[in-house]
Amino acid sequence: MKNILPFLTRIPIKGDFEKARRELWAFPLVSVFTSPLPALILYLKVPLASILALLSLYFTIGLLHLDGLADWADGIMVKGDREKKIKAMKDINVGVAGIFAVVTVLMLQIYSLQLVPFYAIFLAELNSKFAMLLAMATKKPLGKGLGAYFMEALDRNQLLYGTLIYLLLYIPVIIAEPRNLVSFLGLFIGLYAVKISLDNFGGLNGDCIGAVAEITRVGTLVVITLGWRI
């Protein structure tokens, strides 16, 4: 899976672009690499732990998905036909909707991380990466970018292996603490973002998949917060 890591993280290793297409099954496994540092910060309960944990997460994964969320939100909020929405999403300038979406996602994550178990960030990242895989499984690319290139290579075997890895990582956490089962709802929040993308744009590109990743992560943290506090 070393070839897929450079596409989803800032971990300084070299990956082969063509080989990465054959490692899409490893998307859920990437959460094992992206969540330990923020989880450790939360576990140690250092001052401003939730802020530092989130900063460490984005230091690890980069800001590409967050940028995609901003572009996605701009496209979603534009009134008009599909062409206008796609044009707004591809505009290099970030609009008010994009800024609002990014700020909202960041604030919800910071707030939620103060109220959930330290390992909740792992569940959130696991759901986030699996939701990206499910988004690509729609096989409805928008344009001919990286998203389309990966979708073309995603077959049933890769999807099956990715699902098995997701379950192998997810189930032990649920067995250890059944209340964490509520986190599964976060995955459906991400899938709803996929539906919104298809309804508005007719397909998915890298921005859409990045938005799905961000929305799934924050959605998972929010539902875990509600599950543990109600």
Curated annotation (Swiss-Prot):
Main location: membrane
Domain of life: Archaea
Segments passing through the bilayer: 24-44, 46-66, 96-116, 117-137, 158-178, 184-204
Keyword list, A-Z: Cell membrane, Cobalamin biosynthesis, Magnesium, Membrane, Transferase, Transmembrane, Transmembrane helix
Locations listed in the record: Cell membrane
Membrane topology: Multi-pass membrane protein
EC number(s) stated in the UniProt entry for this protein: 2.7.8.26
Metabolic or biological pathway: Cofactor biosynthesis; adenosylcobalamin biosynthesis; adenosylcobalamin from cob(II)yrinate a,c-diamide: step 7/7
Pfam families: CobS
Catalysed reaction, written as an equation: alpha-ribazole + adenosylcob(III)inamide-GDP = adenosylcob(III)alamin + GMP + H(+); alpha-ribazole 5'-phosphate + adenosylcob(III)inamide-GDP = adenosylcob(III)alamin 5'-phosphate + GMP + H(+)
Family annotation (InterPro entries): CobS (IPR003805)
GO MF annotation: an example: cobalamin 5'-phosphate synthase activity
Example of a GO cellular component annotation carried by this entry: plasma membrane
Cofactor(s) in the UniProt record: Mg(2+)
Family named by the database record: Belongs to the CobS family.
UniProt cross-references to HAMAP family, sorted A to Z: CobS (MF_00719)
Function of the molecule: Joins adenosylcobinamide-GDP and alpha-ribazole to generate adenosylcobalamin (Ado-cobalamin). Also synthesizes adenosylcobalamin 5'-phosphate from adenosylcobinamide-GDP and alpha-ribazole 5'-phosphate.
Name of the molecule in the record: Adenosylcobinamide-GDP ribazoletransferase
